Amino acid sequence: MDVLEMLRASASGSYNTIFSDAWCQYVSKQITATVYMYCALVMMSLLFIAWFLYFKRMARLRLRDELARSISTATNSSGDLRGLRFRKRDKMLFYGRRMLRKVKNVSGQMYSSGKGYKRRAVMRFARRILQLRRDNMPLEMRTVEPPAEYLEETIEGSDRVPPDALYMLQSIRIFGHFEKPVFLRLCKHTQLLELMAGDYLFKITDPDDSVYIVQSGMINVYISNADGSTLSLKTVRKGESVTSLLSFIDVLSGNPSYYKTVTAKAIEKSVVIRLPMQAFEEVFQDNPDVMIRVIQVIMIRLQRVLFTALRNYLGLNAELVQNHMRYKSVSTMSGPINSQTSQSSRQAPNGPPMVINQLNLMQSAASGTGSGVSVTVTRPPSSPSRHSREEHTLSDPNPNPDGSFHGTTNLFTEVHGDAPNADLFQQQQQPSVGNLSTRRSSITLMTPDGSHSCVQTPGVTTSIDMRLVQSSAVDSLRKELGLSEEDSHIIEPFVELRELEPNVTLITEGNADDVCVWFVMTGTLAVYQSNQDATRAKQDKSDMLIHFVHPGEIVGGLAMLTGEASAYTIRSRSYARIAFIRRAAIYQIMRQRPRIVLDLGNGVVRRLSPLVRQCDYALDWIFLESGRAVYRQDESSDSTYIVLSGRMRSVITHPGGKKEIVGEYGKGDLVGIVEMITETSRTTTVMAVRDSELAKLPEGLFNAIKLRYPIVVTKLISFLSHRFLGSMQTRSGSGAPGAPVEANPVTHKYSTVALVPITDEVPLTPFTYELYHSLCAIGPVLRLTSDVVRKQLGSNIFEAANEYRLTSWLAQQEDRNIITLYQCDSSLSAWTQRCMRQADVILIVGLGDRSHLVGKFEREIDRLAMRTQKELVLLYPEATNAKPANTLSWLNARPWVTKHHHVLCVKRIFTRKSQYRINDLYSRVLLSEPNMHSDFSRLARWLTGNSIGLVLGGGGARGAAHIGMLKAIQEAGIPVDMVGGVSIGALMGALWCSDRNITTVTQKAREWSKKMTKWFLQLLDLTYPITSMFSGREFNKTIHDTFGDVSIEDLWIPYFTLTTDITASCHRIHTNGSLWRYVRSSMSLSGYMPPLCDPKDGHLLLDGGYVNNLPGHLWRYCRASMSIAGVFPPFCDYRDGHLLLDGCYTNNVPADVMHNLGAAHIIAIDVGSQDDTDLTNYGDDLSGWWLLYKKWNPFTSPVKVPDLPDIQSRLAYVSCVRQLEEVKNSDYCEYIRPPIDKYKTLAFGSFDEIRDVGYVFGKNYFENMAKAGRLGRFNQWFNKEPPKRVNHASLNEYTFIDLAQIVCRLPETYAVNTAELFSEDEDCDGYISEPTTLNTDRRRIQVSRAGNSLSFSETEMDSDVELDLKLERKMDKSTQSSPPTSSRTDMRGKEEAKHMANWHWGVKHKDETGSGATVATHTQTGQEQELQQQQKLQQLQQDQGARAEQLVDKDKEEDKENRSSPNNETKN
């Protein structure tokens, strides 16, 4: 609110709302009389009270004298009683009755209307006069400091492991995946090296064949440049290693290398553990699965650590790969070469090789003599220029626009069934051999020295024998895979040939389905990567060229070994012929020859540049458990860290010992980069919130790359600039007193979310499905339960031996999805503990209308994940129209909760159905579009960092425009996730958060505005104007009547209000406490209302608009936000006693505060007044008489000079104006100002008119935004495509591939429990309160559920029958259309498919004793066992089918009896 505007209105006599100008003059003249009158009244009141107390005392004295006289008379009549005394028991009885009698009298006086009534009346009158009334203090939120473990690292060592073994486990990631016997065998080969200062650990020309781990001391690793200078890469300290895992592959593949540029020297006396790489040979011979797993881990490290650090953060792409490799021969044949060579030339860079005349080629092959040559065979283009700019797929006549393939089955067209020697040109969409007869033919020869010889024979008919080409491709791929000639029969059935036209896409980046190993026979392939440079993203969005693949080279080995998606996009650069082997075929070959993984890995390593090898020595792959510190405060900063997975927390320790959260880092963030560049000590301590993986980039390596590749400096400047701009936008307002924990620069975008139920009554599965449904609109999301993981990875996946498989699989799922939901079990199982370790945030789900007590299971969750952020989610049924209440009790009982959410649930969430029914129900729900205005969508946007905030500014009666803008926002389809307000905006925002119904909000706002126009109420509220004109009592009553005793915590939508704390001289943000009080404080305009005294600390709070004009019981903070200085008194906070005034003095549009609280997109509505900036330049001095003359002389030109109140008002709003300009210039806020300047601050009688102005303006504004395409970030930020139906029980489309498990057929012992396959909850179906979950002796089972509902609800019986009929039809169609199972299908997959089929039919197999499902243990070791298992499963299925038929008949008979029994009873 504006003091200047009110004074001007008073001077002009144009108020017409509260008081007139004549009345103001009367008050100014009679001020002395008013003082005397009030003093006389107070003196009379004091005299009356003194007389009353004196009269009571005199009456008590007279009564005492009468009692004394009566006692003395009785004593004289009875004689001398000095020798008598009372017994102790009598004394106790006497005094006890006396005290009880007094207590009874006092308690009776509290409610009686007789004795003491006059005294109570006088005291009430005195309290009213002297304002001695004491408010009933509401329930306060307990401010509990987080536990010490939340901000402290874990400092615990492992005393049971020897130091050398512990350093080996910690330093090199691959050792962590060895089993204990294998690791102990490796330890036998270790050697201890003692080095003095200056001794070389290794130097140039030494063999690179060992792993070095520093046990004590320090080692310096540096590189030698060509000019003789050296540059340090890193300093290796205690527990760290010096090794290159790429050299590890060279040694194992039989191609050991030497140190060419890297040297290691001891800085001080050191002890180093040396482990020869040859020691692994002995282990790998006996354990081929260990070899495959080690190679896979090395390749994953190469892709996730080296490529991630060098590409995404240093801007290096093509520098990582050698682009000029020596051409290899495709095939070597003996025979003379036709000497009719017209010319010999090099192949053109962009032109395809010509076609060879096979007549001469066959003659030379038949002769069997001649020198070795290389023959390249391909087809020339008919018009190269016509095809050079468009992409084609190989099998689809209508290819995708991007040239990508449609899937694995359509990726390549089969040549001719399974025949490997079929004619290549007899495929669809390809020209026949006859088309080649009229074309120009040529021969391209490649000599052993790499030169090309091209012979052109125009007009000669070609006759190509594809069997020769097939044989050449098989021989070349056999050599690339390191197989002998005797192994040709293994690879021959899987080799396929294809001809490519220019710009045909073989695989796209991020595709995991079309991974193959491609061998180029003729032509050239180009390898691309997406442009990751943020600075050039808007200018150049095309893919970046990495390198070319020439004839004789192989590509695709990295994605094949890692089992992950392809990191590159591969296209044909010219007409080319390739030979390839699919992923499934490669894995089948690996089963027979596991050592091909070494040759595939060696092929990948040969392609890498020397820079990658040097970086491999310096970069480290670190795995941290929860609570472990990355670095500590005040340590030297010699490296930076990249978060690959997990979550980190930065904590600063102040000089007094107090610790504070500085920030949190998630996947992809760079930690410690600023300190490393500035060469300053660590300012904070960074620790792992959960199990995390990091890549360590030393300072020496960073400097070496920076000198060699200056583009790194540009990338670094861009990165630091974005971080600096982000910190500048979030700096203001974050450090103010009263700011919550969320105000810290902590990111609110989570990758993993764990869902924990408080009790068994919580419908956790429907809740997870609803949240999953809302998250699917934002991006790819995955829902995981214990049963889903078991079905995918085996029932024994949670055992310690399978730790690597589980963690790798979960990490891969997290990389693929923007968010992963971990649904915990209802007990503290192994899966629940795993969820706690993987979660970035834990959602504790409870029922809002139930008891708030903390259970034992919930306390265990807090103990397991002390450092993980926890948020409370309270569910409310929509049918009961219940509103949140008693939220403070929930939060006070759980001090570890940092945030809470109220979620209104539809009826289907609380349905009492079995797990199968719930899965089937949500399989249909997931096909629909989610409601973006629901509470689940609001929660989904919060978890993914896409929340939409609404900020309402202050402006007095002009705030009625907020109601119209709210209606326009609702009609525009914009969801509101967070609301903040100042002054009148605090009132309107609180109304919306409380009801979320525009009709109800409008009615309440209109009623409050009408109360503000009643003059007689304002006259009764007048007081002596020392602090303010009004006492604020009636104003408080209007706000309290509007909200009642509601707390901010009980609002549906997260809400905050902003006030000006005149006690601490800053603004305060209120996110909890009394609503009406803080709204009143935010409306306390200086001079009209006294500041509100904060009950927390006693600080005086004014209108928050003085510092920020755009931003418990609820009404108190609303009242505090409306404490206009001078009009209403400051409101005293009931928590600390601070005085609160209107928030408009500090920040009238607190959009920056909303941004700090986590809102990504903000709509800010400003209705405040605007100051006149067109003032008169009056020179160096100013005379008041001159101004008076100008004012009263109508013949002179008017001047605009601010008067004293105007100057004071402008000074008060200096901070607010500066803050408003920052909000207008920000990129995260949409600033809107309706045209309401003609309305006065106190024109509350024009509510409907101002509201209509705001509605019309808002409607037109959002329509124009929609036409301009700017409305999408508010109401169309999610994916509008209809969701696709997915199978949530399995993850067949993309899963982690454990080569050791697949290739070596490891014995996997698992339990086939048919009871586990029927539901996702291993404990029970449905709720625990259902009779079926507790009755374990029931032998009868439901088959096809003919006419019966598992929920025992009579109203659902018909729908269940219809659903079963649909399921039966679907099963019949699927069984008829499904192809026969391949012979290479894994046994585990067959079992799951059969049991899942039985599950869909509703069959639960239990033994005759009723003890549950029979558990059979199987072991996969060979083809014989597979056949035996197949026969057993078929027999088991037949037995189940026969038993099912019997049970169906039996159930039908019982159903008929049950249905007929009620009719018989009614007849009887």
Curated annotation (Swiss-Prot):
Motif position, GXGXXG: 954-959
Span of the annotated motif DGA/G: 1103-1105
Membrane topology, from the record: Single-pass type I membrane protein
Residues annotated to bind a nucleoside 3',5'-cyclic phosphate 1: 174-301
Polar residues bias: start-end ranges: 332-348, 357-366
Domain PNPLA, first and last residues per copy: 950-1116
Record flagged with keyword Transport: no
Composition bias type Basic and acidic residues, residue spans: 1385-1395, 1446-1459
Family (UniProt): Belongs to the NTE family.
Name of the protein described by the UniProt record: Neuropathy target esterase sws
Principal subcellular localization: endoplasmic reticulum
Reactions it catalyzes: a 1-acyl-sn-glycero-3-phosphocholine + H2O = sn-glycerol 3-phosphocholine + a fatty acid + H(+)
Group of enzyme by EC: hydrolase
Positions with a binding annotation for a nucleoside 3',5'-cyclic phosphate 2: 480-607
Cytoplasmic side, ranges: 56-1468
GO CC annotation, single: endoplasmic reticulum membrane
Organism of origin: Drosophila sechellia
Upper classification of the organism: Eukaryota, Metazoa, Ecdysozoa, Arthropoda, Hexapoda
Subunit structure: Interacts with Pka-C3; interaction inhibits the catalytic function of Pka-C3 and the esterase activity of sws.
SUPFAM superfamilies in UniProt: cAMP-binding domain-like, FabD/lysophospholipase-like
Gene that specifies this protein: sws
Positions annotated as active site in the UniProt record: S983, D1103
Residue sites binding a nucleoside 3',5'-cyclic phosphate 3 per the record: 596-723
Gene Ontology annotations of biological process type: ensheathment of neurons; glial cell apoptotic process; lipid catabolic process; membrane lipid metabolic process; membrane organization; neuron apoptotic process; phosphatidylcholine metabolic process; photoreceptor cell maintenance
Residue(s) carrying Phosphoserine: S442, S451, S1197
Record InterPro entries: Acyl_Trfase/lysoPLipase, cNMP-bd_dom, cNMP-bd_dom_sf, LysoPLipase_patatin_CS, NTE, NTE1_P-loop_dom, PNPLA_dom, RmlC-like_jellyroll
